[in-house]
């Protein structure tokens, strides 16, 4: 042994023992244990504090709800059914539109006949020949007006032989109103006008002015209708608006959200952007008997596969608000998770990724929609083209997506040949405003068993043209649907229940009246 060390020990300094090592180890264990206990207590405390964000409202009795209208449910349904018989189909090509132009004009006349008080007491402006803007002047011009929006055009109908009832027949049975436009969006337009007609019959006069804007080409992007409606407001110095409510998300019956047994009324406080990117590959072709090692189709297929397998990273910014509202109403295990997103968010995001409908709420989606190459079985084409539609989540920009495409493909043979239909994600409306409280409270009055929650609108609406008119834009329609009904939108057998259509009328009626109370 080193003499110096031996001397130290001889002078009374003790050697390290296993006991001291054990003491240090036990101290570390105590620290870790206390830390874990502290984290657990914080998780539990967060769960306890995670209470409902649904306001307490006066639930309307059935007698009170029904007292405002003299029309029966079936009479209301018949008027909507008649509205669906007009083939107000939106087409981009002028020669195609010409054959449907009379249908729009006939629909205008139908509205004048069906809602005489609306057309007597409200000022109507026809915009771009077919879009409609009504002005219901308020008693106090110092108050900001509100805008209720919708659209009167519908998408074309395909596979007519698969429809239970012809899409423009105006068919009604004991339960449903069948036809193109019942859900998107003549149901909302007619319900709004029914509610106004009833309010006028009672002599109701709003404190603030109310505008109603119904575009004629929403299904094509609103570039003629809503775009010119915005110009009309700007030219006439109308606005800013207190809020805008347009078509949007429905009330979905469970199961929709994990751990939640109630229906969800989702209010779109923003909406995704969009961009179409066309990819092209040009490589020498030739006869199929002498193929080269690479082909335009093969190279492009690999590029598209890379994009599908490497989507943009998730962005849970606005989706956190959905979790914040809905998570508070979930059963305990899920409430524990959603009240502690700081810890469990990566796990929740991974779960969302397994379901396309939920994954669309957290990331920019990638959809290959067009692929063109070749026209003969024994000829290798020298060119292949593909168009990918991206729906851009708030937090990403369209430029981010262009960079993403180039980075993921990383192949000089693949060129971006065209970029089109660029829409940036919409601004986000506040959930703490009086306007949101008005909307949430009115929904709960009419549908007391639902959970109202803000979310991202994954499709685009006419509101893309209205961003400059207000900070408060909401996208919601009180249709009550099951998940299986969503395919009827733009699909086969579009329909709405007679009972639910009456609820639409009730909802807009009380929304207008509640502006006096909540704003």
UniProtKB/Swiss-Prot annotation:
Zn(2+) 2 binds at residues 151, 184, 246. PROSITE patterns: ARGE_DAPE_CPG2_1 (PS00758). The keyword Phosphoprotein does not apply. It holds the Pfam family Peptidase_M20. Zn(2+) 1 binds at residues 184, 219, 490. Its EC number is 3.4.17.-. The active site is at residues 153, 218. This is Probable carboxypeptidase S-like 2. GO terms for molecular function: metal ion binding; peptidase activity. It is a single-pass membrane protein. One of its GO terms (cellular component) is membrane. It is found in: Membrane. It comes from Dictyostelium discoideum (Social amoeba).
């Amino acid at each position: 042994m080193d003499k110096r060390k031996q001397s130290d020990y001889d002078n009374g300094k003790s050697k390290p023992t296993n006991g001291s090592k054990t003491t240090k180890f036990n101290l570390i264990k105590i620290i870790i244990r206390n830390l874990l206990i502290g984290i657990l207590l914080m998780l539990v405390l967060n769960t306890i504090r995670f209470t409902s964000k649904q306001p307490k409202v006066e639930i309307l009795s059935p007698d009170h709800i029904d007292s405002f209208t003299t029309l029966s449910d079936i009479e209301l349904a018949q008027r909507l059914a008649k509205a669906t018989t007009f083939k107000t189909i939106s087409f981009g090509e002028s020669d195609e539109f010409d054959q449907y132009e009379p249908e729009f004009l006939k629909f205008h006349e139908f509205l004048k006949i069906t809602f005489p008080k609306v057309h007597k007491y409200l000022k109507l402006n026809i915009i771009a020949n077919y879009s409609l803007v009504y002005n219901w002047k308020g008693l106090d011009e110092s108050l900001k007006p509100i805008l209720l929006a919708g659209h009167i055009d519908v998408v074309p109908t395909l596979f007519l032989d698969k429809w239970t009832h012809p899409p423009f027949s105006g068919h009604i049975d004991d339960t449903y109103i069948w036809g193109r436009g019942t859900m998107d969006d003549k149901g909302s337009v007619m319900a709004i006008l029914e509610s106004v007609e009833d309010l006028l019959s009672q002599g109701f006069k709003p404190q603030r002015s109310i505008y109603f804007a119904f575009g004629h080409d929403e299904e094509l992007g609103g570039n003629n209708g809503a775009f010119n409606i915005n110009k009309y407001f700007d030219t006439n110095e109308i606005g800013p608006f207190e809020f805008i409510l347009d078509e949007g998300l429905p009330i979905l019956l469970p199961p929709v959200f994990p751990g939640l047994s109630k229906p969800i009324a989702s209010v779109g406080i923003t909406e995704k952007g969009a961009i179409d990117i066309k990819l092209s590959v040009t490589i020498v072709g030739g006869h199929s008997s002498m193929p080269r090692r690479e082909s335009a189709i093969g190279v492009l297929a690999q590029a598209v596969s890379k994009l599908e397998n490497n989507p943009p990273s998730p962005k849970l910014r606005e989706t956190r608000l959905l979790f914040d509202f809905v998570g508070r109403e979930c059963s305990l295990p899920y409430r524990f998770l959603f009240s502690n997103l700081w810890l469990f968010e990566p796990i929740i995001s991974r779960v969302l990724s397994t379901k396309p409908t939920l994954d669309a709420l957290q990331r920019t989606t990638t959809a290959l929609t067009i692929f063109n190459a070749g026209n003969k079985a024994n000829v290798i084409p020298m060119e292949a083209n593909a168009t990918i539609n991206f729906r851009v989540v708030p937090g990403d920009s369209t430029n981010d997506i262009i960079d993403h495409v180039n980075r993921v493909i990383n192949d000089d043979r693949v060129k971006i040949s065209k970029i089109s239909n660029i829409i940036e994600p919409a601004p986000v409306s506040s959930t703490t405003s009086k306007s949101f409280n008005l909307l949430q409270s009115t929904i709960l009055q009419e549908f007391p068993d639902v959970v109202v929650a803000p979310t991202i609108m994954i499709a685009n609406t006419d509101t893309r043209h209205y961003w400059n008119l207000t900070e408060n834009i909401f996208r919601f329609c009180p249709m009550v649907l099951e998940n299986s009904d969503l395919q009827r939108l733009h699909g086969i057998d579009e329909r709405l229940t007679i009972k639910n259509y009456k609820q639409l009328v009730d909802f807009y009626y009380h929304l207008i009246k509640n502006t006096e109370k909540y704003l």
